[in-house]
Amino acid sequence: MEKRTSCSVQTSTNCDNSLETLNSAHQATGAVQMRIKNANSHPDRQSQTKSMILTDAGKVTEPISRHRRNHSQHVLKDVIPPLEHPMVEKEGYLQKAKIADGGKKLRKNWSTSWIVLSGRKLEFYKDPKQQALPNVKPRPNAESVDLCGAHIEWAAKDKSSKKSVFQITTASGNEFLLQSDIDFLILDWFHAIKNAIDRLPKNPSFGSLELFSFQRSSSSEQPSHCHIDRKEQKPENRKSFMFRLHHSVSDTSDKNRVKSRLKKFISRRPSLKTLQEKGIIKDQIFGSHLHTVCEREHSTVPWFVKQCIEAVEKRGLEVDGIYRVSGNLATIQKLRFIVNQEEKLNLDDSQWEDIHVVTGALKMFFRELSEPLFPYSFFERFVEAIKKQDSDAKIETMKSLVKSLPPPNHDTMKILFGHLTKIVAKAAQNLMSTQSLGIVFGPTLLRAENESGNVAVHMVYQNQVAEFMLTEYDKIFSSEED
């Protein structure tokens, strides 16, 4: 009886153990099914690796979470703004020649290119239509120059016999020559590219987007260092990445604070007129109005004009092609800068020994006046006067017009044309006739305010007026007190 009872108890115990085993197995199966169901219900998880790894001992290790979707998609998206195409700062046609590729010299071959300056890049196209091609990467026949670490300078004569040429040398050893016959155009390009280079770091690798590269998978966009294999990333690298990420967030907030302070400062700063009245900001000599320059110097003839004329008459009257030959543009710009800064100027200094630099600066001064030497309001009247057929009537009309000019215009004109008559007197040596000087100075001294009419016809009259002023100088300025 006791034996039967113990057997039944043992049987019951075994049954209970079997039931527990079945229940646990059922629960485990249900848990696995639940995990499978949950995994299938989230498509994003399908791309993740298996979370159960079977070791050699046949044991199941703890699940390893490799789900880093929050870091790569949510945090990074808020911190790093989407990349945008850089804004075009300048574009236009220039003559271009590539003379070196990676330090290897190339045969110089000039061609006209449509050049686009944007951010840290200078791009060359055949024409504007090629630049505008949508969604073409890379654009056909387009050449791009990285300005980071580049160097720009005015080209030496051994580089090119053309005038107004500057050279760009990139960090990779490529060399380009850019040129234009229009002085102010090539100057604008030189300063625009130089400013772009100065804004960039000197080290080409610094500032580029090498910190992170974005590697896309089917489920997420994960940031990684350019020089680290994703498969070999260690936990220390992940911590370092998160540190840099939080550091960039603080940098962004710092930049926003600086921007707000700058906006407040700019909104509170005094106006340009106030600064000019206090003498803090002064008008420059080049590019100003003739009356403004004379009023500031308490004279009717600008001091710079007098100095240039004296220098030319001292050592340039017999120089071949005086006023026709162009001087070195970089040296002319240096002279212009000194004059604008009101620094002491000595044109007898050895750096100004080339008389064509002095004449080039004088022509630039008259060309850049905000209103030409012949005022806009007198343009049509001088053109009508030069059209007269009767010589005496033409002289009298010209004389009357010159006499009615404002004192700064009248006195400066008298000194300038008096100087040019001395150039004509030496025409046998310098080969500069009245016609040649008329062509050089006509468009510089006399031009319409709005060139809406025939530019070619205007140019003919401009040259004729300047030439007539030289030919009849004594009669036009006769009976006037010096």
From Swiss-Prot:
Gene3D superfamilies attached to this UniProt entry: Pleckstrin-homology domain (PH domain)/Phosphotyrosine-binding domain (PTB), Rho GTPase activation protein
Topology with respect to the bilayer: Peripheral membrane protein
InterPro entries named among the record's database cross-references: PH-like_dom_sf, PH_domain, Rho-GAP, Rho_GTPase_activation_prot, RhoGAP_dom
Any Gene Ontology CC annotation: cytoplasm
Broad class of the protein's primary localization: cytoplasm
Record domain Rho-GAP: where: 288-477
Site (described: Arginine finger): R324
UniProt cross-references to Pfam families, sorted A to Z: PH, RhoGAP
Biological processes annotated in GO: regulation of cell shape; small GTPase-mediated signal transduction
Single Gene Ontology MF annotation: GTPase activator activity
Residue positions where Phosphoserine is found in the record: S51, S111, S205, S208, S250
Tagged with keyword Cytoplasm: yes
Domain of life: Eukaryota
Compartments reported by the entry: Cytoplasm; Membrane
Sequence ranges assigned to domain PH in this UniProt record: 87-198
Alphabetical UniProt keywords: Cytoplasm, GTPase activation, Membrane, Phosphoprotein
Notes on the domains: The PH domain is required for localization to the membrane.
Function: GTPase activator for the Rho-type GTPases by converting them to an inactive GDP-bound state. Has activity toward RAC1. Overexpression results in an increase in actin stress fibers and cell contraction.
Name of the protein: Rho GTPase-activating protein 15
Source organism (scientific name): Rattus norvegicus (Rat)
